Amino acid sequence: EAEPYIIGLTIDDGTRFEREIEAAAPALKPDLEFAGFFAIIGTYVGIIPVMIGLLWLPFIKKISKSKYHFFLALTIGLLLFLGIDSIEEAIDVVDENLSGSFNGNLLIATTVILSFLGLYYTSEKLTSRVDSIRISKPAAIALMISIGIGLHNFGEGLAIGAAVGLGSIAFSTFLIVGFALHNTTEGLAIAAPLSRGKPTIGKLLGLGLIAGAPAIFGAWVGGFAFSPFSSVIFLSIGAGAIFQVIVIILKWIREEGDSNLSSAAAASGIATGLLIMYLTSIII
């Protein structure tokens, strides 16, 4: 079992630096058994909930334009909460595990901004070439949403893998159940823009895997080679990606006719999305 330790370092002038390790335990050795175990966890936390959320698609296809704007705005609310949640998790990692020499808060801000700018440039190129690359604009937006959610789920996988690796069974179980319930809303975020296109089953499965499968890779990295620095980087990249997707959806709503984003559907949709995510976060 994991045991607490205090690790100290004394330098030439007698100054001593100490750090308490709450639960020191041998690192997991990568093997097929543990790899399969983490893959099952990642599937349960990432892929299955996203696929369940995609079941909203037939319903959204039948609704009116104003209700469609509501669901697009709902997507913004869901994603905004995820982006803020990613930054909060990154700050927690900085406070608990990262040396002050990394200047963690500035690292988070810089990574979020660079991620936002890089992915925004990529998405603009993608949406501007929708005709030449034979992909519809709704599908392009859904793809960017899937990528943003996938980066966020990678960070969730890191947290779960690290908890399992430390032997924190109760905490890791809480994370698995909590993230699984929380992530069922993510499929809805992907389904909303797709409802105005003609997605095939293959495309839906592909987008679901892009959004959910990174949880598996995150669990592998977190369980076998957890690094606080890399965790902060990936969580921050995920936040930047999510904020970039929010901007894309806002532009999409404006192009759909709500130029000032001031309609009741848009305002209530964003508020409802935030409320849904908040309630699921405190219930679990």
Q: What are these language model-derived features?
A:
Residues P4-I284:
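Intrinsically disordered, metal-sensing/regulatory segments
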